[in-house]
Amino acid sequence: MPELPEVQTIVDYLNHHVLDIFIKKTIVHLPKILKNKTPQEFEKLLINHKIVKIKRLGKYLLFFLSNNLVLSVHLRMEGKFYYQAKEEWFNLAHTHIIIEFNNGMQLRYNDTRQFGTFHIYEQQSFLDSKELKKIALDPLDNNFSAQYLYEKLKKSNKAIKTALLDQSVVSGIGNIYADEILFAAKIFPTILAKNLTLKNYEKITKEAQRILLLSIKNKGTTIHTYKFGNDETGLFQKMLLVHTHAKEPCQICGTIIQKTKVNGRGTYYCPNCQN
């Protein structure tokens, strides 16, 4: 699943290509992707309007339209956007929604797993929607701090790895970055969140911000299928220190990296550095 850096990379790419172009038509091949509109309603709300800006909220992409509507998209496991010429070949079997612009280009939503979601809301109330109102601050938000995280988790009985994956506590962090953040902060992934001090949360916050920004700079992490633009891959996978490195020597101390399960999620850690 694309995490904060991958979603931000996609947002940056689309902001560079699809803004301020009139939408000519829409094609919906898989109506279940549209969660609160029919294909006919979707087209009626989009045609003859423009995308004026795109923002990220946690792992959601928010398309702000010129008619004061917001299209909220979650890519889930395998969702991808391609901005391509109308005549350019594409995989029709997995392309479920197409937004065609009046410049001959199309924004194509491709999703092999079909788990992605599209919602349309009024701009003045979209943050009150069921799925968006529970999204917490992410580490790159100006209001995010160690104190914020400490207050959220000081009574939590969850393992800190599990807590960092809870989008109602802190948004945007997924399995890859939780492993890397805890390794950098020298915190064992199964320690209970309530047993960590404010100083521990200061380390987590500092490393989360550093790692996420570095990943954005490197266009995210491609381990399995994440791509942006037209099949471009991220580079941050080359910088991972523990995630995917089970049975390899730790690059800091030489101890063998271990892999375990924490609340069902594959978790990589150094038993020495994170002791």
UniProtKB/Swiss-Prot annotation:
Belongs to the FPG family. NCBIfam families: fpg, PRK01103.1. The active site is at 2 (schiff-base intermediate with dna), 3 (proton donor), 59 (proton donor), 265 (proton donor). PROSITE patterns: FPG_CAT, ZF_FPG_1, ZF_FPG_2. HAMAP family: Fapy_DNA_glycosyl (MF_00103). Coiled coil: none annotated. GO terms for biological process: base-excision repair. Binds 1 zinc ion per subunit. A zinc finger (FPG-type) spans 241-275. One of its GO terms (molecular function) is class I DNA-(apurinic or apyrimidinic site) endonuclease activity. Its cofactor is Zn(2+). InterPro entries: DNA_glyclase/AP_lyase_DNA-bd, DNA_glyclase_Znf_dom_DNA_BS, Formamido-pyr_DNA_Glyclase, FPG_cat, MutM-like_N-ter, Ribosomal_uS13-like_H2TH, Znf_DNA_glyclase/AP_lyase, Znf_FPG/IleRS. This is Formamidopyrimidine-DNA glycosylase. Involved in base excision repair of DNA damaged by oxidation or by mutagenic agents. Acts as a DNA glycosylase that recognizes and removes damaged bases. Has a preference for oxidized purines, such as 7,8-dihydro-8-oxoguanine (8-oxoG). Has AP (apurinic/apyrimidinic) lyase activity and introduces nicks in the DNA strand. Cleaves the DNA backbone by beta-delta elimination to generate a single-strand break at the site of the removed base with both 3'- and 5'-phosphates. Its EC number is 3.2.2.23, 4.2.99.18. DNA binds at residues 94, 113. Signal peptide: none annotated. It comes from the Bacteria. Keywords: DNA damage, DNA repair, DNA-binding, Glycosidase, Hydrolase, Lyase, Metal-binding, Multifunctional enzyme, Zinc, Zinc-finger. It catalyses: Hydrolysis of DNA containing ring-opened 7-methylguanine residues, releasing 2,6-diamino-4-hydroxy-5-(N-methyl)formamidopyrimidine; 2'-deoxyribonucleotide-(2'-deoxyribose 5'-phosphate)-2'-deoxyribonucleotide-DNA = a 3'-end 2'-deoxyribonucleotide-(2,3-dehydro-2,3-deoxyribose 5'-phosphate)-DNA + a 5'-end 5'-phospho-2'-deoxyribonucleoside-DNA + H(+). Monomer.
